[in-house]
């Protein structure tokens, strides 16, 4: 039976109850892990309030600001993890953003500023968080990120985010190679389309979901819980020989040719 008792898991990217990160946090908690979460700080504190209220049933022992574009804030986050827990076993990276200018129209029209921002938040941040987690994973650990099929194949309106996800998947492999000698495993989950705050920015998300329901072998899209269960598996010792992989949780859509 999957058991994460005694493990400390830090989850980034929870925005609301439709976030895939929320589904992952729930399954890690159910498996016995102690949970910490981050939120994107804003002037009125709305995101912090929302995340605290949502995650209250999980009894998180850490609720921290986590703007990955702010190096000082990232350093402070891991300092707090060290002070509270002393170690870290599981890091969940569920961070992605692209300005609308990078998700509509022609790829050749994407502004340089939008490209840089998307790559920093969606791709570079995995390595940045891994750098902070590395010295805390003294007994090994598991780092898990979320990706999407649009990083491998062209998906309408995914544009800049597809390029960011392609870079993210390669980051998984390079980090796995670097951190493997410390028994730190790094994997990605490529989930099928789910209606989330992030996916709502991508035009035609409902069409994408309906297409998967028609084409995928299971004739449906996946749920937060199914992605969360896969993350819990990858976080556990049951997956101790798996690293550097992208695991598709998409009802089999990825295997279809037509």
Curated annotation (Swiss-Prot):
The keyword Oxidoreductase applies. Pathway: Lipid metabolism; fatty acid biosynthesis. InterPro entries: Enoyl-ACP_Rdtase_NADH, NAD(P)-bd_dom_sf, SDR_fam. Its EC number is 1.3.1.9. GO terms for biological process: fatty acid elongation. Substrate binds at residue 98. It holds the Pfam family adh_short_C2. GO terms for molecular function: enoyl-[acyl-carrier-protein] reductase (NADH) activity; identical protein binding. The active site is at residues 148, 158. It is an enzyme of class 1 (oxidoreductase). It catalyses: a 2,3-saturated acyl-[ACP] + NAD(+) = a (2E)-enoyl-[ACP] + NADH + H(+). Gene3D superfamilies: Enoyl acyl carrier protein reductase, NAD(P)-binding Rossmann-like Domain. NAD(+) binds at residues 13, 19-20, 67-68, 95, 165, 194-198. Keywords: Fatty acid biosynthesis, Fatty acid metabolism, Lipid biosynthesis, Lipid metabolism, NAD, Oxidoreductase. It comes from the Bacteria. Homotetramer. PANTHER family: ENOYL-[ACYL-CARRIER-PROTEIN] REDUCTASE, ENOYL-[ACYL-CARRIER-PROTEIN] REDUCTASE [NADH], CHLOROPLASTIC. Catalyzes the reduction of a carbon-carbon double bond in an enoyl moiety that is covalently linked to an acyl carrier protein (ACP). Involved in the elongation cycle of fatty acid which are used in the lipid metabolism. Belongs to the short-chain dehydrogenases/reductases (SDR) family. FabI subfamily. This is Enoyl-[acyl-carrier-protein] reductase [NADH] FabI. It comes from Synechocystis sp. (strain ATCC 27184 / PCC 6803 / Kazusa).
């Amino acid at each position: 039976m999957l058991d994460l008792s005694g493990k400390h898991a830090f989850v980034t990217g929870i925005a609301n109850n439709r976030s895939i990160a929320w589904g992952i946090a729930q399954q890690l908690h159910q498996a016995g892990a102690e949970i910490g979460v981050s939120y994107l700080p804003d002037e009125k504190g709305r995101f912090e309030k929302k995340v605290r209220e949502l995650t209250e049933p999980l009894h998180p022992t850490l609720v921290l600001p986590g703007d990955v574009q702010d190096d000082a804030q990232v350093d402070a986050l891991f300092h707090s993890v060290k002070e509270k827990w002393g170690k870290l076993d599981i890091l969940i990276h569920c961070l992605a953003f692209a300005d609308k200018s990078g998700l509509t129209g022609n790829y050749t029209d994407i502004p340089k500023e939008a490209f840089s921002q998307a790559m920093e938040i969606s791709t570079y941040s995995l390595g940045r968080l891994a750098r902070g987690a590395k010295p805390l994973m003294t007994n090994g650990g598991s780092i898990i990120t979320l990706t999407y099929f649009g990083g491998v194949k062209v998906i309408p309106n995914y544009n800049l985010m597809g390029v960011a996800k392609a870079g993210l998947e390669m980051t998984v492999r390079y980090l796995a190679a670097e951190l493997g000698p410390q028994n730190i495993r790094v994997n990605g989950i490529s989930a099928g389309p789910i209606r989330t705050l992030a996916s709502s920015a991508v035009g035609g998300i409902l069409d994408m979901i309906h297409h998967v329901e028609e084409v995928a072998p299971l004739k449906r899209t996946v749920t937060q819980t199914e992605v969360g269960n896969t993350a819990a598996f990858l976080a556990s010792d049951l997956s101790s020989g798996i690293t550097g992989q992208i695991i598709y949780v998409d009802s089999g859509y990825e295997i279809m040719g037509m």
